[in-house]
C-alpha cells in the first residue's frame, strides 16, 4: 500500500504531505518560523525574498533589511523561536533539531532558564515530537575560550549536539579540536557546516579530523566518488537544504541538485529547511520541489523522510 506521503507527492496534495510525519534536522532557531506566521503575529507585511540571494552575505543583508527591521530585539527573538515550534505542529515535524548560539542562550540567562523557556514552546505546540537542541559556534570564534566555557552549557545535558557555522575555511579544522574533544566528554553529536562552499576534500577532512557523525550541507561531496564512498562506508549523515543551496547560488537548480548524486552513491542524506524565514520553503515543499523537478522519485524521497525520522 502506498503511504500518505508518497500519495501526497504523486497527487501534489499538500494536506497529505503536511500530515505525514517528517523531520527537520538543520534548522537555525532564530530563522525557523514561517514568514506568513511572523507577519501575522507582528501585524506587518514582510516581503517575499527574491529568488536569488547573493551568497551568505546577500542572505544576511536581506535578513537585516527585511526581518530585523520589523522583528529585532529579545522578545522578537523569542517570538521567532516560538514560530519554529508552531511550524513543527503545522507540518507534523515529529523530530526537530534546532541550533542555538551561546549568545542566544546567554540572553535568556542560565541554561536552566533557557531549557524551561524552550520546553514550554515544545510542550505547547508539539509535545509528542522529539526535540533536540544543538549548540552552534561561529567559525571565526576563539576556540580555546569556547572549549573552556562548554561545560557551562553542556553539563545540564540539554544540548545534544555541537556544530560550527558562519562560513567555511576561516580556521583550519584542527583549530576546532579543543572544542570537539571537550564535546566528547558530554557525548554530544559532532556536526559541522562544511561542503556548502568548501570542497569534497574539506568534507572528508572535517569528518576525519573532528570525528563528525553528521555534516550540515555537505553538497560538494557530490564532486568526488572517493568522498561519497567514504561518507557511505562510515554512515555519515548529510543534512541537505535544497532551497537554501539554490537561492544562495550553491546549486544551479532543483533538477540538477547534488542531492541526486549523493543518493545515487549511497550517501545517507536528510532534507531540511536551514533558515525557513529566509528561504521561504517549508519542509513538505522541499520534498515536493525535488519531486516535481524530477530530481528524485517519490520512493527515494520517502526513504529520505524515513531516515530523518530515525526509522532507517
Residue ranges, per PLM feature:
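Metal-cofactor-binding active-site regions of metalloenzymes
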Residues: 1-188, 197-205, 209-214, 220-237, ...
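Conserved hydrophobic beta-strand within the GNAT/NAT acetyltransferase core sheet
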Residues: 190-192
Amino acid at each position: 500500500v502506498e503511504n500518505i506521503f508518497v500519495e501526497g507527492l504523486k497527487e501534489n496534495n499538500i494536506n497529505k504531505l503536511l500530515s505525514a510525519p517528517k523531520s527537520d534536522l538543520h534548522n537555525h532557531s532564530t530563522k525557523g518560523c514561517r514568514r506568513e506566521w511572523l507577519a501575522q503575529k507582528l501585524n506587518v507585511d514582510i516581503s517575499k525574498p527574491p529568488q536569488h540571494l547573493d551568497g551568505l552575505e546577500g542572505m544576511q543583508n536581506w535578513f537585516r533589511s527585511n526581518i530585523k527591521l520589523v522583528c529585532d530585539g529579545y522578545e522578537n527573538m523569542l517570538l521567532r523561536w516560538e514560530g519554529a515550534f508552531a511550524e513543527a505542529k503545522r507540518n507534523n515535524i515529529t523530530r526537530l533539531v534546532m541550533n542555538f548560539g551561546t549568545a542566544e542562550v546567554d540572553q535568556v540567562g542560565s541554561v536552566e532558564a533557557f531549557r524551561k523557556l524552550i520546553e514550554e514552546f515544545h510542550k505547547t505546540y508539539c509535545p509528542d515530537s522529539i526535540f533536540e537542541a544543538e549548540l552552534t559556534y561561529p567559525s571565526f570564534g576563539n576556540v580555546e575560550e569556547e572549549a573552556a566555557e562548554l561545560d557551562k552549557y553542556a553539563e545540564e545535558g540539554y544540548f545534544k549536539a555541537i556544530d560550527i557555522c558562519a562560513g567555511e575555511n576561516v580556521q583550519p579544522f584542527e583549530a576546532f579540536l579543543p572544542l570537539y574533544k571537550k564535546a566528547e566528554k558530554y557525548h554530544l553529536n559532532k556536526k559541522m557546516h562544511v561542503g556548502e562552499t568548501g570542497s569534497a576534500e574539506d568534507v572528508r577532512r572535517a569528518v576525519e579530523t573532528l570525528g563528525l557523525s553528521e555534516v550540515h550541507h555537505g553538497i560538494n561531496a557530490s564532486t568526488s566518488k572517493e568522498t561519497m564512498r567514504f561518507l557511505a562506508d562510515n554512515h555519515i549523515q548529510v543534512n541537505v537544504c535544497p532551497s537554501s543551496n539554490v537561492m544562495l547560488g550553491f546549486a544551479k537548480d532543483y533538477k540538477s541538485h547534488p542531492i541526486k548524486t549523493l543518493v545515487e552513491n549511497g550517501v545517507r542524506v536528510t532534507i531540511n529547511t536551514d533558515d525557513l524565514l529566509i528561504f521561504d520553503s517549508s519542509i513538505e515543499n522541499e520534498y515536493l520541489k525535488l519531486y516535481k523537478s524530477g530530481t528524485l522519485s517519490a520512493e527515494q524521497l520517502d526513504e529520505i523522510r524515513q531516515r530523518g525520522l530515525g526509522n532507517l
